[in-house]
A protein has these predicted regions:
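Short, Gly/Pro- and small/polar-rich lid/capping loops
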Residues: 1-54
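Poly-acidic low-complexity segments
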Residues: 30, 122-124, 149
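Glycine-rich, flexible beta-strand/loop modules in the N-terminal catalytic cores of phosphate-handling
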Residues: 41-130
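A generic structural motif
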Residues: 89-96, 141-149
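Short, conserved phosphate-binding/catalytic loop or strand-edge motifs used
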Residues: 130-138
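Positively charged, low-complexity, intrinsically disordered RNA-binding extensions
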Residues: 133, 145-154
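Glycine- and Gly-Pro-enriched alpha-helical subdomains that act as flexible
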Residues: 152-165
């Protein structure tokens, strides 16, 4: 996980001590064994371009849309990919509705970087007519519940949506 996202929540001395003691005792708050993974469910919606990922108690819904646009001058043969994240106020008490907060922006950047660096979306394949028409792909991720592994759940949802493009 990117260190900047982790730094948005500060641990108290007691919380740090609790975590260290739990790790030394092979205990997890949710009752899983140390090497046990969270249950994952991936669903693709009835509508094209929608998905839902549940990773343990974390719940992410996503939607991919596209429109034909003129390409950027410096990338005449490539379409575009944009990631937007939004936290539901019910996802976590620290998240506020309205304009995307720092955590939402950072999560979007992490997912965007992961998709680009893995080349999960070939932006050249989004070109319809060189210099004239390309696809602009937009992936919207809605965080409905944050029960841990948020970066993983968001990445899985975005990857699933990108495969639907």
């Amino acid at each position: 996980m990117d260190g900047r996202l982790a730094n948005t929540w500060k641990l108290t001395v007691n919380e740090k001590k609790f975590i260290e003691t739990a790790l030394a005792s092979n205990l997890r708050i949710d009752g899983r064994n140390p090497l046990e993974y969270r249950k994952i469910t991936i669903k693709f919606g009835r509508e094209d371009g929608s998905s839902e990922v549940q990773l343990g108690q974390t719940h992410v819904m996503g939607l991919v849309t596209g429109q034909l646009v003129q390409p950027y001058q410096d990338r005449q043969n490539e379409g575009t990919l944009s990631i937007f994240t939004e936290f539901s106020p019910m996802a976590d008490p620290s998240f506020e509705p309205g304009r995307p907060g720092e955590s939402a922006v950072e999560l979007g950047r992490i997912v965007d970087r992961g998709l680009r660096e893995s080349r999960a979306v070939d932006t050249e394949s989004l070109c319809v007519l060189a210099g004239k028409l390309v696809w602009a792909i937009r992936i919207d991720l809605h965080i409905l519940d944050n029960g841990g592994n948020l970066v993983d759940a968001a990445n899985i949802a975005a990857l699933g949506l990108s495969l639907n493009v």
